[in-house]
A protein has these predicted regions:
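Carbohydrate-associated surface elements
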Residues: 173, 188-200
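Conserved donor-binding/catalytic core segment of Leloir-type glycosyltransferases
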Residues: 211-229, 234-238, 362
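A charged, aromatic-enriched C-terminal amphipathic alpha-helix characteristic of glycosyltransferases
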Residues: 350-377
């Protein structure tokens, strides 16, 4: 692992469930100084209650200033106007962000930092923070999200890819597309906290009380219930197999009404990351019911490896990154395909198969991913 580096990381807000970004930076903070910059926003807020709550949370973050997570990791919430893609506003934000981030970096003790960004709209900050190198870490096709300024984001991302010293991409498709603009682009898959999710196999771990009385088998999902989740598919599976329990865990930011009329669908809401192994212990199969579109064909679902590290059989929509796990996960097409694949997964499951899935995830830890990334960073030059 790289050591004694200063890193300014631009990503989503630190608070919340761990993601690839938080896993990587938490590990790096063991030997390096990290300034994590909370999200500066990639879309304009709407008049929705969700956006109003988010703006209020941003206001509270601004008041907090620099927040210490551990001795080497601090979180900053700089001031920015949430109107991305507007030229005058983008220039203003660049000035505001440059001044505030330089201030926070000094307070956190950073010198000659690596600028490590997960966000295309930070391209205007390249060259302004005294950085030693620039890393663009692409984990999604951002222009495919709903409500974003697509053309502006594509232009920002292309400029960022061209200027980066190193580009990391979490799927082969993302890497191939960005390599057209920068040959220093590398595919680095997501990792998994194997020890955490493997707790699901422990006989001493009790399943959550709210799942104990549910009829088996339990077909489970955890994660954000968002635009890329095929709710119609889930509802139809539930109708076809009323003897199955469809258990959905996660915050929903879309209308889930199509599921609420199904007596065998249970929406439990968001649960703490620490409790997910216990919920996995209740699952008989883990599903990844994604819509197949421009966003998801470039995705590499974290939950794939998390389900497998919990020993679960997995049935997923047909995504390129899932296909690589043939023998560990099944891909399915449509309602008929999902029902048949789940039936097969249930019939072929057993303790030996669950242990084998956990063992297969051992080389895919977040620590291993950080070592892989560190080797790539060591191969890049330091900016003059």
């Amino acid at each position: 692992m790289i050591r004694n580096e200063s890193i300014i990381c631009f990503a989503h807000d630190w608070k919340g469930d761990p993601t690839s970004k938080t896993h990587i930076m938490r590990i790096l903070s063991e030997k390096n100084r990290i300034l994590w910059v909370n999200s500066i926003g990639m879309r304009r807020p709407s008049v929705s209650g969700r956006d109003a709550r988010r703006l209020a949370a941003k206001g509270r973050q601004l008041i907090q200033g620099l927040v210490r997570v551990n001795a080497n990791l601090h979180v900053a919430s700089p001031l920015a106007v949430p109107l991305p893609g507007v030229p005058g506003i983008d220039r203003l934000n660049t000035l505001l962000l440059t001044a505030s981030i330089r201030h926070f970096a000094r307070r956190a003790g950073l010198t000659r930092p690596i600028l490590w960004t997960f966000l295309p709209n930070t391209v205007g900050l390249v060259g302004r923070l005294g950085e030693s190198r620039v890393i663009y870490h692409c984990v999604d096709e951002y222009s495919a999200f709903a409500g974003v300024p697509r053309d502006a984001l594509r232009a920002m991302e292309e400029a960022l890819v061209r200027r980066a010293d190193l580009v990391l991409a979490s799927s082969e498709t993302l890497a191939q597309e960005r390599r057209r603009f920068n040959p220093r682009t590398h595919f680095v898959s997501h990792g998994v906290d194997v020890a955490h999710f493997a707790q699901a196999l422990s006989p001493t771990l009790a399943p959550p009380r709210e799942t104990m009385g549910l009829p088996r088998p339990i077909i489970g999902f955890f994660g954000l219930i968002a635009e890329w989740i095929d709710l119609d598919l889930i509802a139809e599976i539930a109708r076809r197999r009323p003897d199955w329990t469809m258990l959905m865990i996660g915050k929903a930011n879309v209308d889930t009404g199509v599921l609420r009329g199904q007596p065998n669908v249970h929406l439990l809401g968001q649960k703490p990351y620490a409790t997910l192994p216990a919920y996995c212990r209740s699952f008989d199969v883990g599903i990844i019911p994604f819509r197949v579109d421009a966003l998801t064909v470039r995705a590499n679902p974290l939950k794939l490896r998390e389900y497998l590290a919990a020993g679960l059989p997995v049935v997923s929509s047909d995504l390129p990154e899932v296909r690589k796990y043939a023998g560990l996960a099944r891909v399915a097409h449509g309602v008929d395909g999902f029902v048949a694949a789940i039936e097969t997964a249930l019939a072929e499951d057993g303790q030996a198969a669950r242990s084998a899935r956990v063992a297969a995830m051992a080389p895919e830890s977040w620590e291993a991913r950080v070592e892989q990334i560190s080797d790539l960073i060591d191969d890049t030059g330091v900016r003059a």
